Amino acid sequence: MILRRLLLAGSLLLASLAAAKKEGPKITATKFDHEPRHLFYFEDTDTVVFQHKYDAHISTDAGQSWSVIKGPDDGMVGKVKSIYPHPHDRKKAYVFGQSRTHWVTEDAGKSWRAFKIEQDIPRSGNPLAFHGTDSDKLILHTIDCSGFVCDMPALYTTDGFKSHKTLTKSQHGCNWAITTPEFGTQADLPEKIDNRVFCIFSGLHAPMGRNKRLLYSDNFFEDDKGFEVPLNNGRPVSDVVRLAGVKKFLVAAAKSPRTTEMTLYVTDDATRWHQAMFDGHKLENDAYTVLESTNYSIQVGVKTTGGFNPMSALYTSNSEGIYFTRNAEHVNSNHLGYIDFEKIAGIQGIFLINTVSNWEEIDNNHQRKKKVVSQISFDDGRTFHDIKAGDKKLHLHSVAQLHNSGRVFSSPAPGVVMGVGNVGDHLKEYDEGDLYVSNDAGITWSKALEDAHKYEFGDLGSVLVAVYDEGRTNKVSYSIDHGKHWETAELPHKIRARVLTTTPDSTSLKFVLIGTSKSGSGVEHSVIGIDFSNLHERKCGKDDFERWPARLNEKNEPDCLMGHKQFYSRRKAGSECFIGSEFKDPVPELERCKCTEEDFECDFNFVRSKDRKDCVPARALPVPEGQCKKPDDKYTGSSGFRLIPGNDCVKDGGIELDKPKERPCSDAAKEPVSGEIDVTKHFFSANKPAEYYYLERPVLSKDKDETIVMLTDKLEVFITRDHGKTWKETLEGKHVVKLWPHTYINDAMYFITGEKRVIVTKNRGDSFREFETKLLPNRDRLPVLAFHPDPERSDWLIWTGADNCGRGGDCHSVAHYSTDGGDEWHTLMRYVGRCEFIGKERSRKTDELIFCAQHENENPKNRHLRLVSSDSWFKDKTVHYNNILDFRTMAEFIIVAARSEKDSLKVGASIDGKTFADAEFPANFDVKVQQAYTVLDSSTHSVWLHVTVHNVEDHQYGSIIKSNSNGTSYVLSLNNVNRNNADYVDFEKMEGLEGVALVNVVANVDEVQKGAAKQLRTMITHNDGAEWAYIRPPAKDADGRAYSCSPGKKGTEECGLHLHSFTERPDYRDTFSSPSAVGLMLAVGNVGDHLTLKSEGDTFITRDGGIEWHSVKKGNYIWEYGDQGSIIVIVPEAKPTKALFYTLDEGKTWTEFAFSEVEMLILDISTVPSDTSRNFLLWGKEVGSGSKPGFATVNIDFSGLKERSKECVLKEDKPEADDYYLWEPKHPLLEDNCLFGHITRYHRKKPEASCYNGGDFERLHNVSTNCECTRQDYECDYNFERQSDGSCALVPGHQPLDPKRICTEDSKAIEYFEPTGYRRIPLTTCEGGLKLDGFKAFPCPNKEKEFEKKHPRLHGAGLFFAIVLPIAAAGVVGYYVYTRWDGKFGRIRLGESGSSGDWLSRDSPLIAIPIAIIAGTVAVLSALPLLAASLWRSARGWTPIGRSSRPYSSRGAFAARRGDYVGVVEDEDELLGAEDFEEDEEV
């Protein structure tokens, strides 16, 4: 048994003492100066191993004597870091060394073999993942750090570390499909499953390890990157956090985004997965524990209350691990997740639990002390009974309060159970308990010994051993009659017992006791061997055994479970003998029973009825083909029951609940599809909605409601659960003035009143709770509520209120915090500007990190703020910046804007919330402090800022600057970008697609500075702001007529597509794109030289990420995406209408649909934020004849439409086999689909497929191997600016950043690079190819030797021959070829279709290679003065080669693109592979 609770570690073997009392056990003590760790037995042997400081010690006589394991060549001495036994192979164990040498034994410690790896072993946790049936197969998790960056490679071996290979370079945990010996025992698993491996990886492009993915491979990821596991109805799931084996099941746990929910998925064949369904309960993050389970069910404890007094509910699954039934509530647990639940070893169906009797008091007051009571079940949790000692209730300390290693109550000894506890109303403290024993598997109990003791079982229960556990003792107690009578034996000296243990199967007569004792001023540790082998000479005979029934029913008769009765041959309590069958586990005798109701469970697709007597359909049932042609038909199907797999009851003469039965077709498939769109209109008396919010269900949630909370302009609160088909008014008379949704949890909504009272719902409006705040809402227009970003801290709140605001008062804002959802408030800080929690994901260490802006000198009249932080609720604080304007927490950065000493804008950035670095702005970019700034985005590993350059009302515009990957060094991305009076900017990132953004720029800057109206033009970037271009307009409008201007292949200043953007939207949630409709954008605009009035615009769509646009409707429409873009609805904006238009094929065709008999003015159209629903909601008013007063909502439901009635089929391993295809975004000027250095592939529904996408899923299929770098992977470096030809040049009068800074900032740096004017775009992952940065390296000061080792150079003769010999050889070959080649240069022969095929022909490698070398050399030499960094690097070295496919066919084609995306110098087309001549030049 592996130790769970040991205290100290160390090494120094001091002494060995032996003592033996006549007719008593043999006792031997060995002293150590540090306590042993990791003690375990090799099963079925007397061999024990433990770690003592940095040595491993071994005993082959059950602890009587000990020696140090030396290993091969004494290599293990003083080098041991950790020890792990193999859980499925009793002879194997693994010792990990302090360096990279480790050892394995395959003969229970008799010999050891060394093996080496090149990575380090993580400091915590077991690094090994074991195969369930092949002990030679293991996965080893390692860590490999370089500087501050660490990878987590996983290695694997199939021969027990005689050899090993890399499984994956980085992971968050890998495991075998077959994790336990029981897995797959009831299924015919294909051979490939034996090698199947599952790994959790970081999400593609997800920051900070978010959106983890579960992938599998059957060939150790050698030929592929693995396939995502189809956990959810055949589709992958993001944010998988754990994978574990439980008996015959594999269980995967996934987090639900923007909720505290956790979802479990279960499989019993590593292929087909099902979502675990819990009976009316949802799992919370880190709030469940998979308990000891059986071969036919999973036991799970689900935390129901947290805080200082956690409790859990106990659930048991059906045999497939899918449907879970609640067996017990209010089960006692601790803050570590340990739950008071334990099965009786070796006996099916019996387990003990502790429940909390005063759970209602605990719910109302978490400070109350729990009253814990013990119960026992003899029928697998169907019923529970009090534990009795005589006629009194007995309560026992269990798993939540461990006091020994191994199991708490029982061992493989049949029926013998012990525990420490007390009789009475509830469980008392441990030291108030006594030792109790049961001889009949827990039915009856009696007191064994006074006081609390540690205890163990030996010789299958023939010997019980106990040692006093309330203080020091020099005695050990033992019983040989099942605990009826006890004797004592003297220990060599007094000890404080720490661990008492024996062989895992409890068949031995030998025990090991570990204890501590005082030695002078220190503590010494004793490992004591206790041997009862010679206590009796007689071995038990046949008459000494009884046929003992393992379970008894209420009539005291042998009971049936899983179709059989269970009996053991057990030594009689009064027999004075020892069994002596060492290392032979007890084998039960099974007697089959007739089938009863208890032998059946609900069939698949069925769940228990509320009265638990029947099984009712859980969902629409599948119908045999050809049946149920009419709704009132019947068909023969499942009865709802099935025999529990593994149950061996006899049906003959018993109950048969699984006989097929006739069912009504109403139980079967859902209602026939109407083929039509459903419309539901609802009227409100108010004039308009003041605000509304969707409380969207996470994709993994079993509930599918579509909830909206709305506040009208009459301050009425309405809630709908069905997307606006029905509305219900709530919170009448509560004077709600503002809705405040939880920023991170979708289920929660806060209702702000005009008083100190706040109302909250955490279950989407099912129930409400009120709490009082200390102050009224603040008057400084600050957020009144701030939330903690970690889901498990969703009750942590910051309230910013107004204090001392009476007449003549010193009115200011004060922040209070609560950690219990508003029940108790504590002052956080006075005179604040704004406060925010910083989650542990960013701060890495603490949940309590908070940032606040506070008035300097706590003077509200002082407009100067300072940025402060604290991780102790501001008992202590750190001042980061003085004189700030404001701060923002973005996706990857914390950004602060402050005034510099020169009254200019100064920006600081932090990634971890601890260290800030000042940003360096581009040259000639001195921004006055009164100029506005806007943080635009920080989701692509860089910060985007818009800084206003011209700040006259209605005439504002400014520049977009973009940072490097740590947010400190900014470069100019684009000038003259439009901004409005509210500081919003015409800038929008395309959702779901990296690097694409649109802006509107002011075209007439000079006129605007003189007071003229702005003329706007739209520009787009496809490489994250490194380059911008005008949008190429479509050739024809929606009516098929050509536009008045035609730009050709690119947009120009005179002719482009210009779009109305962010600053003109009444609702900023209405965006061009949708995160779930990858590649699609809709917009209103016009074709011409600038943007005209919105009323004059038309509606356009793009399907390829903004490269090609199409005019879909004349006029101005508002739009919404549904079902992830498979349905798009548009409605005329600001124009009365009775009809909408929808498309099912991404805008290629449109269908008109009338939704109202009366004309309506539609103000907005909405759907769930993820755009995954087939329901839409129109918000508007009836106008004209027959109109009703007030405003109305109109639900448009497409789920009945025939073309959207069947769910699409997606297979990750065959992604284009059914209803989907793989789409690759691209850059408009690159021939291949490399974007940001890689090819990205997304799942997109085939437009012609008649099906619906359903719930949101991970659309990103994979990211291919990195591409070679091109110009589009670079942007201009700090103090460099883009020239008219696209190149980057130093700003006159300024210098680049000092490249030597890296040497002082990173102590491990050995070199720095000469600035080239270019830097890599933070998003890019390209490798090789065009290298425009870091071209020439120099050694850091005092790192010359390391630099020389990294960059060895040729000297002397070696350098001479390296230069001269290739030139001489080329000359000889060239002369020989010239004189003998039949093609000879300049020679033209008519009628020849190709080369002769001779070895000296033009296509011969002998000719082609020298020509390529010469041509490449000329090209490079001619380019060196212009662009020294323009070299192409291949995988073979530094050969100057081009890309596999040329982006341009001629110099003319290259030149034709100048002025848009070109970012190279004049002659770089030759480097990029342009042909030597124009296509129409004469030869």
Swiss-Prot record:
UniProt entry keywords in alphabetical sequence: Glycoprotein, Golgi apparatus, Membrane, Protein transport, Receptor, Repeat, Signal, Transmembrane, Transmembrane helix, Transport
Main subcellular localisation: Golgi
KW Membrane (keyword) present: yes
Stretches forming BNR repeats: 58-67, 103-113, 375-385, 436-447, 478-487, 718-728, 817-826, 1100-1110, 1141-1151
Membrane topology: Multi-pass membrane protein
Membrane side Lumenal: residue ranges: 21-1356, 1427-1483
Gene Ontology CC terms: cytosol; Golgi apparatus; membrane
Residues of this chain annotated as glycosylated in UniProt: N295, N966, N1262
Coiled coil feature spans: none
Transmembrane segments: 1357-1377, 1406-1426
Domain of life: Eukaryota
Extent of the signal sequence: 1-20
Stored InterPro entries: Sortilin_C, Sortilin_N, VPS10, VPS10-sortilin, WD40/YVTN_repeat-like_dom_sf
Biological process according to GO: Golgi to endosome transport; Golgi to vacuole transport; protein targeting to vacuole
Cytoplasmic side: 1378-1405
Cell compartments where the protein resides: Golgi apparatus, trans-Golgi network membrane; Prevacuolar compartment membrane
Entry similarity comment: Belongs to the VPS10-related sortilin family.
Function: Functions as a sorting receptor in the Golgi compartment required for the intracellular sorting and delivery of soluble vacuolar proteins, like carboxypeptidase Y (CPY) and proteinase A. Executes multiple rounds of sorting by cycling between the late Golgi and a prevacuolar endosome-like compartment.
Name assigned to this protein: Vacuolar protein sorting/targeting protein 10
Organism: Uncinocarpus reesii (strain UAMH 1704)
